[in-house]
Swiss-Prot record:
UniProt record, GO biological process: chromatin remodeling; transcription initiation-coupled chromatin remodeling
Keyword Flavoprotein found: no
SUPFAM superfamilies: Actin-like ATPase domain
Oligomer status and interactors: Component of the SWR1 chromatin remodeling complex.
Protein name: Actin-like protein arp6
GO cellular component terms, semicolon-separated: cytosol; nucleus; Swr1 complex
Matches recorded under Pfam families: Actin
Function in brief: Component of the SWR1 complex which mediates the ATP-dependent exchange of histone H2A for the H2A variant HZT1 leading to transcriptional regulation of selected genes by chromatin remodeling. Involved in chromosome stability.
InterPro entries the UniProt entry points to: Actin (IPR004000), ATPase_NBD (IPR043129)
Keyword Transcription annotated: yes
GO molecular function per UniProt: nucleosome binding
Coiled coil, from the record: none
């Protein structure tokens, strides 16, 4: 039996919130407040879809460097989220909340969060956890649809690669518990990749340093992970035109609000056009080689191997046989093939390496939350009465998932 029927699962990402009733449908809402180009309009969350001009938008996000710090912004976004999932009551007293937080969330942030949950929204019960801790639940099917069939042999040992907006974490989960001593962080996330693409385009093509929204759309449309970086760089030097080069038509806001890839290079285009070649794979390459921009850290494959070395060899082998990727950066074409290839080259030859690719790595933790057993929820939740008795210090008295 899963979570209680009035439990809202809220995967509180720094870029997008994924929310909905456990076992129901998930909604994705931008976790930000956006100011329009002229400064006269503010868009909260998914109201941004009503914007007619995405140039020079200014974003105020509730998170800084991956952690929740702007409480007034988050309160406003959560109000919108509750309406979007179908809660119309002013009080949440009849509802429970399962909320995700990043690994290593500071106690001060946890205390402010629990105050927001019980004092501002008045939830009846609350359970915080990391997205990675939700992945092993319902190990038998590992997902809600056949596309995500999971056939790993050791569900008690899962290695989660969570690569999102702010950073990438390598998180071993054993017996449904994060092994914090072995968690590794790579300071490369979607925000850094978009900012780097802005710099590259602005230096080589047009000045787009203020066009975060547009450049992010370009990144998601054209970028991919190279399987052979040196070979692809050589291809990009082909004349007169590299087979990797594409044309991207920028939005002009008269014929459309969004840019698009020009499939026919002979087509007459009225909009400004970006020609992109090695930019397409240079940007995601930072996930595997942060040192390219002088970030002195290991890439994801090396960080995985550094993480598993904290365990005995038999556990290391089980973790590498159960690697699961979540987060928006995992959607780059070629990401899983490159990751599998590099892990295979780093692991001992007699170990099996399996990297499982959810069909929707962004919403996958949210979907897995619905399979948490009711007895586990009841044993670990924090109730409003407990909060009333102990205050925010209840966080130190209760064992988290």
């Amino acid at each position: 039996m899963g979570l209680p029927p009035k439990t809202i699962v809220l995967d509180n990402g720094a870029y997008h919130i994924k929310a909905g009733f456990a076992g129901g449908k998930v909604v994705e809402i931008p976790n930000c407040l956006t100011r329009s180009k002229d400064g006269n309009r503010l868009f909260l969350g998914n109201e941004l879809a009503n914007c007619n001009d995405f140039t020079t938008l200014q974003f105020r996000r509730a998170h800084e460097k991956g952690y929740l710090v702007h409480w007034s912004t988050e309160t406003a976004v959560w109000d919108l989220v509750m309406r979007n999932v179908g809660v119309m009551e002013p009080s949440m007293a009849d509802y429970s909340l399962l909320l995700t937080q990043p690994v290593f969330t500071m106690p001060s942030i946890e205390h402010n969060t629990i105050q927001l949950v019980f004092e501002e929204f008045q939830f009846d019960a609350y359970l915080p956890c990391t997205p990675a801790e939700l992945i092993p639940w319902d190990h038998g099917s590992f997902t809600m649809n056949q596309e995500d069939a999971y056939t790993g042999q050791h569900g008690e040992c899962v290695l989660v690669i969570d690569s999102g907006y702010s950073f990438t974490h390598i998180i071993p989960v054993i017996d449904f518990s994060v092994q914090e001593q072995a968690v590794k962080r790579v300071d490369v996330g979607g925000k850094l990749l978009t900012n780097y693409l802005k710099e590259v385009i602005s230096y080589r093509k047009y000045n787009m340093m203020e066009e975060t929204y547009i450049v992010n759309e370009i990144k998601e449309s054209v970028c991919y992970v190279s399987q052979n970086f040196k070979e692809d760089m050589e291809i990009c030097h082909e004349k007169p035109r590299s087979k990797l080069e594409i044309c991207y038509a920028l939005p002009d806001y008269s014929t459309g609000k969004h840019g698009y890839i020009v499939r026919d290079i002979n087509q007459k285009i009225e909009q400004q056009v970006l020609n992109l070649s090695n930019e397409r794979f240079m940007i995601p390459e930072l996930l595997f080689s942060p040192s390219d921009i002088e970030i002195r850290e290991a890439g994801i494959p090396e960080a995985v191997m550094q993480s598993v070395t904290h365990f005995p060899e038999n556990i290391q082998a089980m973790l590498l046989e159960n690697v699961v990727t979540i987060g928006g950066n995992c959607k780059f074409p070629g990401f899983h093939k490159r990751l599998s290839s590099e892990l295979r080259s780093l692991a001992p030859a007699n170990w099996e390496v399996k990297v499982f690719e959810p069909s929707d790595p962004i919403c996958f933790p949210w979907k897995k939350a619905s399979h948490m057993p009711l007895e586990h929820w009841n044993a670990n939740k924090i109730t409003r009465s407990e909060y009333s008795e102990h205050g925010a210090n209840i966080m130190t008295r209760k064992r988290r998932i």
